[in-house]
Amino acid sequence: MRYDPGLIEEKWQKFWKNEQVFKAEEDETKTKYYVLDMFPYPSGAGLHVGHLIGYTATDIVARYKRAQGFSVLHPMGWDSFGLPAEQYAIRTGTHPRETTEKNIANFKKQLTAMGFSYDESREFATSDPEYYKWTQKLFLILYEKGLAYMADMAVNYCPELGTVLSNEEIENGFSVDGGYPVERRMLRQWVLRITAFADQLLEGLDELDWPESVKQLQKNWIGKSSGASVNFATEHGAIEVFTTRPDTLIGVSFLALAPEHPLVDLLTSDEQKAVVAQYIKETQSKSERDRISEMKTKSGVFTGSYAKHPVTHELIPIWIADYVLIGFGSGAVMGVPAHDERDLLFAEQFNLPVVSVLNKEGVCINSCCEGFHLDGLSGEEAKQYVINFLEENHLGAAKIAYKLRDWLFSRQRYWGEPIPIIHFEDGSCRPLRDYELPLLPPEIQDYRPEGVGQGPLAKVREWVQVFDTETQRAGKRETHTMPQWAGSCWYYLRFCDAHNSAAPWAKEKEQYWMPVDLYIGGAEHAVLHLLYARFWHQIFYEAGIVSTPEPFKKLVNQGLVLATSYRIPGKGYIYPEIAKEENGKWVAPSGEELDVRQEKMSKSKLNGVDPQILIDEFGADAVRMYAMFSGPLDKNKLWSNQGVAGCRRFLNRFYEMVSSDRVKEDNNFEGLSLAHKLVQRVTDAIEKLSLNTIPSSFMEFINDFVKLAVYPKSAVEMAVRALAPIAPHISEELWVLLGNSPGVQKSGWPSVLPEYLEGQTVTIVVQVNGKLRARLDIMKDASKEEVLALARESASKYLEGCEVKEAIFVPARLVNFVV
């Protein structure tokens, strides 16, 4: 019989859907298993095969766990708010909802074609009012706890996009989306007090089965450091400086303030006002990332003012420097150029003194004055001496600081969750009540922002201006919206109870499913999404509305999928199908030589591969199989369509084997042993997520199995059941072909018996003078004489004409003929 995926795959997809095979149930008699993908933003470009690596891995695990008898939750939804749909609306006038719904339909079609086993009954999009009603409610929980507040913040503002951008949305001073200039501005924004949870976020990492690299990234992002705050007196009040090296205090030769520091105006002398203003203007065009980059030179400007050193009482010049950030520490640093590389670059740039106060061993020198004797001390002893001095003289204190800053939560966009707050003229505000949610955005025609720092909602006066019946006052709705991160902070909880209209989730359902047992997604989310989700979850845990302190038990980052790209230097990328190889070089149709690279699949590089094209040619099961075979799950891998073709050839062979008339009711030990060993290898591979080894295990199995004169039916059934998580369509078809009722998953995961793993034969190596010459499969109970005779026969051409001086025999291991 012939294997034709085009005939069987859609049939079995309909069967799974009609029978609700993948519907998750809260069955208290079963152990639960929650396996989750980082849900996608439904872009217009659709999925390419690079997206399928993680999705295929989670699907294999979900199908395997169901077969083992677990109650499995494996859902999919859509992170559907976001800037791309809004930018498309600005260009075309198409409502973001319309664009999003169209893109979701395309994504669903692609995912269905791959045979992924999602519980479709739990599907939602973050832009569904039924969903973001609860996002708004959860935001108000943060607000009521004092964790959401408004503040004037120095932000990355893009005039062209008309919105605030995060550091991650900027590259080299330009927006990632569109490549528009970005500048720094002070704007009033909503902020979430994530710093209040800095210690919990750090401590919680120790309990997680996550990649160490991700844990370290989060630790670095939080950036906990111990030190001291030091007050430097000026005519306009003290400048507070945080330092991790109080032992170098005597070496301070300048202070540097962030351009946004509140004392800049007061400290700038009349003579310096013009140059300071120009410098601050130039700084506004730089992102924070640009400002702290490791550059050979540092920029700055003198304020014209001085501060008094708290120990020596000397006057120290006060500068403004863009490498100082207002959000870290106090927005001021003490310059110790002898012992800090950045400070040294700055001092050399502006001819400032360099005073050494530590020797090569780290012992304090040149650090004594009246009432202050630091010389000879080092390390923690020296630091503590300085802290004690500062505290006794009311000049500072011990302090712990964090790099982590409160989360800028506002966006000046339309396509995001409206913030459910009403503002009044006296500066007070009122959160909306539950019965007023969801707060829906108005229908608008113009999606462009309204002036600096105001989103498009600000233009809809009849929506903004309200009479609040609760307070009997006129008020204004908040016109900022939430960032795309908001919906993804808690979506994993909604999947526990996706269509609850009375609460974001029922407590008993959250208790049953949480935490997520396996979470797979890209490493690009190592910090922001994962940190923000952990932050919200820990708030919910403290509030008693979730049962676990952490949301994601085990995390795996899938590697990137690379594909060949072809670029005309200085012009751009071309499609692979029009590139030609001539005389060992790749050229464009114009004859221009191409720069050929292996790069991450992307729409911009024109090297993405549409999975539907491969499905149409080879079948979804072959694509799924190669998606795993292409390399270890967590490593980068190079995609090859030829590899998909190879997996299709294997499936052809597997189909022929199972449908062969050699399949009999037989207890052939060798056949059963091969099947049991296969199941054991596949089981181990799934448990360890070494999924790339599974296809080769099957290929080795079939190579040995087809040598049998008779195929034991029970062994064939074991192989089909073991293949089902990886290639589910063909497995369903073959399961029925073998005379079973539809639904291979219901048959359970095959059990492995030890006696079949051990087998009745053993493989030994045959050597001549220590060189491998043959391998032999022999019966375990074969005598030494039998083994030597078989070994001599297998190596006969190497022994011909030679005198065998000795035959070294190691039972069940080897025979070595010494000639």
Curated annotation (Swiss-Prot):
Q: Does the keyword Chloroplast apply?
A: no
An example of a GO molecular function for this protein is: ATP binding
List the EC numbers from the record. 6.1.1.4
Q: Please classify the protein's predominant subcellular localization into one broad category.
A: cytoplasm
The record's catalysed reaction(s) read: tRNA(Leu) + L-leucine + ATP = L-leucyl-tRNA(Leu) + AMP + diphosphate
Q: What cellular component GO annotations does this protein have?
A: cytosol
Q: Which GO terms describe its biological process?
A: leucyl-tRNA aminoacylation
Extract the InterPro entries matched here: aa-tRNA-synth_I_CS, Leu-tRNA-ligase, Leu_tRNA-synth_edit, M/V/L/I-tRNA-synth_anticd-bd, Methionyl/Leucyl_tRNA_Synth, Rossmann-like_a/b/a_fold, tRNAsynth_Ia_anticodon-bd, Val/Leu/Ile-tRNA-synth_edit
Per UniProt, subcellular location reads as: Cytoplasm
The residues that the entry says bind ATP are K603
Give the EC class as a word.
Answer: ligase
Q: Extract the Pfam families matched here.
A: Anticodon_1 (PF08264), tRNA-synt_1_2 (PF13603), tRNA-synt_1g (PF09334)
Q: Can you tell which superkingdom this protein's organism belongs to?
A: Bacteria
| Chain span(s) of sequence motif 'HIGH' region | 40-51
Motif position, 'KMSKS' region: 600-604
Q: Which UniProt keywords apply?
A: Aminoacyl-tRNA synthetase, ATP-binding, Cytoplasm, Ligase, Nucleotide-binding, Protein biosynthesis
Family as reported in the entry's similarity comment: Belongs to the class-I aminoacyl-tRNA synthetase family.
**What protein name is recorded for this chain?**
Leucine--tRNA ligase
Gene this protein is translated from: leuS
